Regions:
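Solvent-exposed alpha-helical segments and adjacent loops
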Residues: 1-181
């Protein structure tokens, strides 16, 4: 807080990756287009499924299950409907073909995230994230990512890793103030 009691936020360097050349057709990531242009709320406008990780240790799996339960409860209050939730081991190719995936965990704790992690623009580890060559670490950090799904470029993948976003956001803005890819 400053002397007036207001919160001030200072950022010396942006945490976003620099813009590059537009990718050629068929390149990864695919070009933005109608239905795959962001922002993150677009991932929730179509059919989606929430996926909790089961590949971690027992404590991690319980923590992820609790996060998913809390997120699903908040979504229910926000959208007046509980989202479908699957374990990572229950996700089939048919699910990947038909739905946007909302993944919770890290590549070490979520089997689906482990399958596509190498094709995401960030590196995700326990309490650490690498974006555009910069590493951010800490026990209270979290990350939310929306990106074309490498397993189905016609759909999105949304990743929640670490601490949940929006602890102090009202329920009406918790899911619509996040950026796009």
């Amino acid at each position: 807080r400053n002397a007036a009691g207001d919160f001030e936020i200072a950022c010396e360097e942006p945490a976003a990756a620099p813009a590059g050349a537009t990718p050629a057709a068929g390149a990864w990531p695919p070009r933005k287009r109608h239905g795959l242009s962001g922002p993150i709320e677009e991932a929730f406008d179509g059919p989606f499924v929430v996926v909790t990780g089961t590949a971690g240790n027992d404590d991690e799996d319980r923590r992820l299950a609790a996060q998913v339960e809390r997120w699903a409860d908040e979504w229910d209050r926000f959208a007046d409907g509980r989202p479908p939730v699957l374990l990572d081991s229950q996700v089939t190719e048919a699910v990947i073909a038909r739905r946007n995936l909302v993944l919770f965990g890290t590549p070490e704790s979520n089997l689906i995230l482990a399958r596509l992690h190498d094709r995401l623009p960030v590196r995700i580890g326990p309490q650490r994230y690498e974006v555009a060559g910069k590493t951010y670490e800490g026990p209270d950090l979290g990350m939310v990512l929306c990106y074309p799904n490498p397993l189905n470029p016609q759909r999105y993948v949304v990743v929640y890793a670490g601490a949940l976003y929006g602890e102090r956001c009202g329920i009406n803005h918790k899911h619509d103030l996040l950026p796009d890819f």
